[in-house]
Amino acid sequence: TTCFVMEEPEEDAADSKPVLRTEIALHETPLVINDTTWYVRPSSVTLRKGKIGIDNFEVERGSQYVHLNGTVSQDVTDTLKLDLNNFELGYIFDILNIENVKFTGKATGQFNICDLYSSRMLSTDLVIPDFSFNNVRLGRLNLFSEWDDAQRGILMLGSIYKNDSTWTDVSGYIYPVRTPEREP
């Protein structure tokens, strides 16, 4: 359901024009992704004066879910938080159309987005117990990653644990944005 509301300007506002606010209410509905039924839970999205507010957006399937809450705007302090629980990484790589590498495994943790319109401060803190890289199962991955705006890539720092006494530290970039110097 979508509702458009014309707000009168505040009396002390320098800009005396009315403001259009858009309120979107999402209702519970099934969603099929790769032949699997997920459920979109009730939530709301508000658009007003360049701000996008997302309240309690959730897509879930049993114990697996993606939960999105927060605000995207020009204000660098506004944050959008994405919580993952047992969420298959392969879906994310398919959606982002990242073909050079293939990460799979069920991730649990947080993804934070700030200052999306400028420096794009994006970061993750994830645990993937059954992590695979290019179809090779490696073990449990503890991963921190963040967007590096200067590199136009995602810096990934983590540790992969095969067992309690064997692990590998990983560090590197993924470049999801094509630039002339990265053309095939």
Regions from the PLM with identified roles:
Residues 1-110, 117-184:
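Interface amphipathic segments
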